[in-house]
Design a protein with these regions (language model features):
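Conserved glycine-rich cofactor-binding loop
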Residues: 13-14
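Conserved glycine-rich Rossmann-like NAD(P)H-binding loop of the short-chain dehydrogenase/reductase
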Residues: 27-44
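The beta1-alpha1 cofactor-binding region of Rossmann-like NAD(H)/NADP(H)-dependent oxidoreductases
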Residues: 39-40, 60-72, 105, 217-218
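Conserved mid-core segment of classical short-chain dehydrogenase/reductases
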Residues: 70, 93-109, 128, 150-153, ...
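Short C-terminal tail/terminal secondary-structure segment
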Residues: 97, 146, 206, 224, ...
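Catalytic Tyr-X3-Lys loop
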Residues: 101-120, 137, 161
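Active-site helix of classical SDR
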Residues: 123, 157
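Alpha-helical segment proximal to the catalytic Tyr-Lys
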Residues: 128-129, 170-174, 232
Length: 246
């Protein structure tokens, strides 16, 4: 149990982010539940953590805005005095994924703004403000290994995350801070299920050797391992959590 450590989880009002917030709170972390726009859902996560005996606050911040990312850390420190863990879960994936040649500028810019710039902003803050022995955990995707048509731009944003993860781990030499990423496969969240037919969902569920979709708790458990003390020798790595899909 980490009774004195503080974790920021971005994009934590729903889905995988909410599951991570609940899991880290159960492990004893005080959790900063970041959200971009859904205050009601974020409040539900905070209330659920409190009902289970944990500590949490909700902080609105669009992490694609550098000033908002800075304020997120400021409010975490104001509430709890420190930050030990950053989980960069916030990200977007459009329900319709056109081929690269059919992708418009607005879609490209929005994906890179949230998925790359948002994580960059919070990593930059964390690099300067995390405690010795801290953890930065980013989110990639197993789609990088699959190379599926239609995912070129989305996967490119996550490829950038993997590169920054590996290099930042080296740049933080001497601080005792690890930087890793988790790359989920198909996971049963609203983000994943939106716009897909039952047949498509069934086909994707059967693709992995374990013959099911991942769950938010599967990913939250992986995150808990990577930010915990047992993974202190894992650094600069991307762990694929996809049931053996790739």
């Amino acid at each position: 149990m980490n009774t004195s450590q503080v974790a920021i989880v971005t994009g934590a009002s729903r889905g995988i982010g909410a599951a991570i917030a609940h899991r880290l709170a159960a492990d004893g972390y005080a959790v900063v539940v970041n959200y971009a726009g859904n205050a009601q859902e974020a409040a539900k996560v905070v209330d659920g953590i409190a009902a289970a005996g944990g500590r949490a606050i909700a902080v609105q911040a669009d992490v694609a805005d550098p000033a908002a990312a800075r304020r997120l850390f400021d409010e975490a420190v104001q509430a709890y005095g420190r930050v030990d863990v950053l989980v960069n879960n916030a990200g977007i994936m459009p329900p319709a994924l056109p081929h690269l040649a059919d992708t418009d500028d607005q879609t490209f810019d929005r994906l890179f703004s949230v998925n790359v710039k948002g994580s960059f902003n919070t990593m930059r803050e964390a690099a300067a403000r995390l405690q010795t022995g801290g953890r930065i955990l980013n989110f990639s995707t197993s789609v990088i290994g699959l190379g599926l048509p239609g995912y070129a731009v989305y996967a490119a944003t996550k490829g950038a995350i993997e590169v920054m993860t590996n290099i930042l781990a080296k740049e933080l030499r001497g601080k005792g801070i690890t930087v890793n990423a988790v790359a989920p496969g198909p996971t049963a969240t609203a983000l994943f299920l939106d716009g897909k037919s039952p047949e498509t969902i069934e086909r994707m569920a059967k693709a992995a050797p374990l013959e099911r979709l991942g769950t938010p708790d599967d990913i939250a458990n992986t995150v808990a391992l990577l930010v915990g003390p047992q993974a202190g020798w894992v650094n600069g790595q991307t762990l694929r959590a996809n049931g053996g899909l790739v």
